[in-house]
């Protein structure tokens, strides 16, 4: 068949789908695996975004960019099209254990991870990415909530270059939660995550193999006015000499979402050193109207020099960036130490 004939045949078998037509929100950010060709003080990053299209189906899209020493952000150009990866089953036919591969000709900003199994048929929600290092090896882990329209399932993707992805479901008696976020390295020889339990409080969990989670320890529970509905993490912690900085979300009256920060012990992360006594960020008047109103939310942040870059969603209709001075936030936390 000629190329024109192939295009005609293909048009009858193709449906156009706009992955971002309803909402674009809940970003996560990590250092890009390629840091070559940059000027001093620059960091290249990967930004993931939750995209919602027709039928309220959530998928994962990507952007990439560079933040320079003056904190200016420059994004890589992206075209108008998004291309899903090619799926292959990798665990004896288990629909929840599969691989996704993108061709070399598809740039990262044009790749989309669309639901590929029954358990996530209605969406891949709130990917929390982390750059994970162990014995000199680096990989990227991302936890997300799979949704089939009735039930949720905690799943994880793993990649080294954002071209080939291995996707699996997490296991264990304590894993049926939302908002699971890995710490960026092992602690005392174990993998560690924070997670929301019971729909309202934060816990710490440990695992030997990073797939099976059977034990939890309490971390934080809502007890202040601006968080009485629930509290949860907003991505993986950042390591500092004073402890782990963990960004959190707090839900209060009128289901108003604000962001906060908690400082955890480096060696015993179930121990809280300090929490901010009031929200770090809250919706501005210009940010409160949207698909889900009165909400600020993020799924991760990134260290850049002496600052922390926070991508955040405003009421599920747009995303922006905030910059946090690491020394200043640590000083506030240590002055408010328990």
Kindly label every feature range from the protein language model.
Residues 1-124, 130-181, 185-229, 239-291, ...:
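Beta-rich carbohydrate-recognition and catalytic domains
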Residues 291-298:
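C-terminal structured domain segments
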Residues 232:
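Catalytic core of Fe(II)/2-oxoglutarate
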Residues 302:
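Glycine-rich phosphate/diphosphate-binding loops that line cofactor/substrate pockets in enzymes
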């Amino acid at each position: 068949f000629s190329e024109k004939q192939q295009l005609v045949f293909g048009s009858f078998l193709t449906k156009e789908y706009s992955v971002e037509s309803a909402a674009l929100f809940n970003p996560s950010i990590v250092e890009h695996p390629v840091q070559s060709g940059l000027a001093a003080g620059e960091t290249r990053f990967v930004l993931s975004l939750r995209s919602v299209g027709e039928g309220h189906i959530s998928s994962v899209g990507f952007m990439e960019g560079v933040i320079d020493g003056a904190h200016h952000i420059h994004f890589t150009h992206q075209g108008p099209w998004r291309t899903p990866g090619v799926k292959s089953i990798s665990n004896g036919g288990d629909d929840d254990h599969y691989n996704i591969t993108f061709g070399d000709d598809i740039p990262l900003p044009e790749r989309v991870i669309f639901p590929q199994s029954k358990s996530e048929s209605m969406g891949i929600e709130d990917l929390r990415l982390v750059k994970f290092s162990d014995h000199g090896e680096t990989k990227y882990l991302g936890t997300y909530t799979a949704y089939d329209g009735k039930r949720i399932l905690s799943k994880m993707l793993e990649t080294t270059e954002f071209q080939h992805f291995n996707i699996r479901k997490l296991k264990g008696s304590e894993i049926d939660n939302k908002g699971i976020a890995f710490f960026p390295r092992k602690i005392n020889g174990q993998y560690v995550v924070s997670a929301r339990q019971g729909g309202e409080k934060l816990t710490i969990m440990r695992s030997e193999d990073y797939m099976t989670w059977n034990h939890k320890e309490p971390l934080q529970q809502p007890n202040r006015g601006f968080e009485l509905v629930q509290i949860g993490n907003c991505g993986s912690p950042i390591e500092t000499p004073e402890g782990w900085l963990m960004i959190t979300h707090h839900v209060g009256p009128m289901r108003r979402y604000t962001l906060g920060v908690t400082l955890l012990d480096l060696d015993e992360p179930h121990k809280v050193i300090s929490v901010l006594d009031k929200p770090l960020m809250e919706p501005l008047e210009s940010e409160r109207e949207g698909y889900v109103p009165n909400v600020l939310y993020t799924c991760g942040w990134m260290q850049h020099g002496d600052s922390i870059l926070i991508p955040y969603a405003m009421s599920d209709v747009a995303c922006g960036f905030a910059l946090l001075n690491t020394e200043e936030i640590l000083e506030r936390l240590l002055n408010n130490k328990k």
